[in-house]
Amino acid sequence: QVAQTDMLLSAPAEVQSVQRWVISSRDNRGAPFLMVDKPSAQAFVFDGSGQLLAVAPVLMGAAKGDQMLVPNAAPMSAIPTNKRITPAGRWWARLAPDAGGKEVLVIDHAAALSLHPIVKGQPHEDRAGRMATATPDDNRVSFGCVNAPVAFFSNAVSPVFADKMGVVYI
């Protein structure tokens, strides 16, 4: 309990404020929730009562912005870097298999937005290296999805969202 309180107290003020609002307004309807704080490039997993369970660095869309273009039939590699945005918003999310059968947290199916374990990507992207740095400044590299450490996804996201939907705030 003390470690969880310490984690929340060390979270950015905006994360603490949104957590208090979610609980006081019951916006999550008692469901677990996950917050992605874009400025700090971190994800925070909470249970339905607002207890902070886990925190991890994340990778986000290569471009800054809050609105994402809905993908069309073009391959992801055809999306220009300046359009690779992790959008801001609130969504009901659930675990589901991706096209390759791997479990992901589907945030917005229509926009192909999900939170998933870090992918290797192109060698020049050095996704694992970017996630390992202490600064969030280099954590913008994805096509828009949120990439999380494998252990964070397996030990926090997957069990918390198993068998139930939850809310994602970005």
How would you name each of these model-derived features?
Residues R20, A41, S154-N155:
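Solvent-exposed, polar/charged alpha-helical surfaces in well-ordered, non-transmembrane soluble domains
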Residues R84-I170:
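Exported/periplasmic cell-wall-interacting domains
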Residues P39-S114:
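Mid-length scaffold segments of soluble, non-membrane domains
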Residues P12-Q16, W21-S24, V36-K38, V70-A73, ...:
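A short linear-motif detector with a strong N-terminal bias
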Residues Q1-L34, V55, A63-L69:
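Extracellular/luminal recognition modules and glycoprotein regions
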